[in-house]
Amino acid sequence: LAIVSDGRIFENINMSSRARRLEKRLRREQRRLSRKYEMRKKKGGSTATASANIEKKKLSVQRLHQRLANLRRNHENQVIHALVEQKPRFITVEDLNVTGMMKNRHLSKAVSEQRFYSFREKLRRKAEIIGIEFRIADRFYLSSKTCHACGHVHSRLKLKARIYVCPVCGYTEDRDLNAALNLRDTKNYRIA
């Protein structure tokens, strides 16, 4: 979810065993609900009016959706609290092209579950309340591809390369931490 320039890493809640277990249960319950509707349709019943068992199953699916949403929201709030409780002078975030990421069918589910905009807006509001300057880095600033040590832009860096190795100076760092350090020091930003 977030990597901070001081090296702290906030994990993606959707990769936790608890979230995966809930998603697995949700898929199972949705399949059961779908089968109930299909059986009702085969028997000639109206799908507009649901039986008591269908209503119970719909309620259990809704509860699971709510539990997953609460789990994600809680994690989001905990991360935001951890970020602002140390009262930094400023917080800089990337202006991500979420619309473009949503067009990639391999990324779209993960991106929508992350709720980037919601996270950024909550963080902005919290920073504003506390009095922390909130910066949004330019969308086209190459934070991941720029070497933090020498400033060289590694234009051929692929997304699957998780370790950044500068071809000029040999600087080696975790790709996301390198991006966090670059975002901290960037002059390409606007204040939100």
Q: Residue spans of the language-model regions?
A:
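Positively charged, helix-rich recognition surfaces that bind polyanionic ligands
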Residues: 1-192
